[in-house]
Amino acid sequence: MKILVVEDSSSMRAYLTTVIEGGTESYDLEIVEAASGFEALKTLPHHKFDAILTDINMPDINGLELVSFLKNHPIYRSIPIMVISTESSEEDRRRAAALGAEEYLVKPFEAGELVEKLRRLLRVA
């Protein structure tokens, strides 16, 4: 299985990768990282992703714009998406869900919570 992690903070990308690899050992996972929404869009045609994790606040294409694009694209709309963000209001969660995100995780989070939500996401795939 292949996961795309879209996060502009290199330290958060490294943390997400470490947590995912440590908590999903029973899955044969490959993690691909993108530092921006634009980089994610350039990466998509070269891989078949089983799930995408994206931050919201990024410098070029934000995570919600990315979710909207993916869920409206015939090739990518079936890929499950988890939004991971410091944006914690119910309105933010509803907006992400309305755009098609299957999961929403607020930073900071417990590693186990990320792993649990990712396992749910991968079952959807």
Regions found by a protein language model. Give the residues of each.
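Conserved acidic carboxylate
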Residues: E7
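C-terminal output helix
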Residues: F109-L118
